[in-house]
């Protein structure tokens, strides 16, 4: 079980607070000038294919020493052991947290309540493999005898974000199937997705553990109505729908053959579920062998995380640097910036992964915390972001630590595109770290023939202060295994930060109140009667909505 340790009461936190007083004056130019081996000292490799360079941060050896001490004092090691050991560390829901078991590629048992879960995990994987083969090979036929050509995954949150992110990131590995994802209860999403599709060749995956999720089931029923408008006979539903669920009764009532129901367990959190049956869309998209490679990659990072000393432990290092900025420098957000167009949903995926996990205001004893917890996560692929929001990162008043991620080898080596992309990748972190001084700007202007008056007027706007922190994560190539490495790396980073902040990272009660109120409001929208049961603003909005749609 996780211990209740207020990080601000630790000796390491107090030492970091004192250290920060002098560290505020750190200058990256000086840090690099003073240490010719700074890159070697503050970078590490994962295997032979991933390099993590954290040298362009406002840290020195003393900073890291205090941060590692903080990890020790908050008992991160015992927390890691508790998670991998199947302890019910999701205390508010009384559940173990074992997404790591889903990608356990060893022969080691994983125990929950005295029972090894691995036989069940491997049975579902075997079922997914067979199903994937039947669909991709064309053996599975629709109700008119045609092969499936399109797969629509209907889910929301973890049942959508993860599979969508991975299938996009691994597009170069796709099978012949066309993948589609529907999540929003806005009817536009399902209607526009279905417009070009043929009911005879479309398979739907309904991803809902309980088979009661409002958004998912609303979309699933609309998909079934669309299908039956063409197919007619409800018996045909079984050839075109499968379920990722544990509610066999509701699945059968919907018309799905329970032989095509793929289960997962309550120790699998939604935002960590792509490794489970929820990943069936991934398996169909890239083939089961590649899905297994994705699991292998995550398992490699799990082993690294569980067994490596903190000083060389990549998720721990990244987590601690994040704590340094969040709790001492006052940074409120972090950017994730993949220089790979296929990874265009990577930041959005970890926006959920991080903000739903660590967006908490009470500690593990239920008391309000007096320090900052999870940051805001955002980002877009490079180079698009450079022409959108990098201005603020470079010259704004907010400190925004940023992760730059890029592959050395492109899947599309057209002309010199990748060299140009990577030149921007390297240039941005250099510019953020070292900036451009007033003197350099003046010299450039004078060399360009500007007058003294022009120089004096324009120089302040051209100065880059630098000292903007970044991590650079260089990957040989984005493939199923390396993507598995990266996803697990960020998952474990988030976990470590939650341990240090003394919060529960695996529940998400913050999503409940809005759903509860929506269920109360829904019947009130059924007629034109004036609503008076809420506050004046909500009443006014509902009544204005009714008037506008009349």
Curated annotation (Swiss-Prot):
What EC number is given for this enzyme?
Answer: 5.3.1.9
GO MF term list: carbohydrate derivative binding; glucose-6-phosphate isomerase activity; monosaccharide binding
Q: Which InterPro entries match?
A: G6P_Isomerase, G6P_Isomerase_C, Phosphoglucose_isomerase_CS, SIS_dom_sf, SIS_PGI_1, SIS_PGI_2
Keyword Cell membrane attributed:
no
| Cell compartment(s), UniProt | Cytoplasm
Subcellular location, principal: cytoplasm
Annotated active site = 356 (proton donor), 387, 515
**Top EC group:** isomerase
Its family remark reads: Belongs to the GPI family.
The job of this chain, per UniProt, is described as: Catalyzes the reversible isomerization of glucose-6-phosphate to fructose-6-phosphate.
Q: Which HAMAP family match?
A: G6P_isomerase
Q: What is this protein called?
A: Glucose-6-phosphate isomerase
Which species is this UniProt entry from? Vibrio atlanticus (strain LGP32) (Vibrio splendidus (strain Mel32))
What lineage does UniProt assign to this protein's organism? Answer: Bacteria, Pseudomonadati, Pseudomonadota, Gammaproteobacteria, Vibrionales
Q: Which gene encodes it?
A: pgi
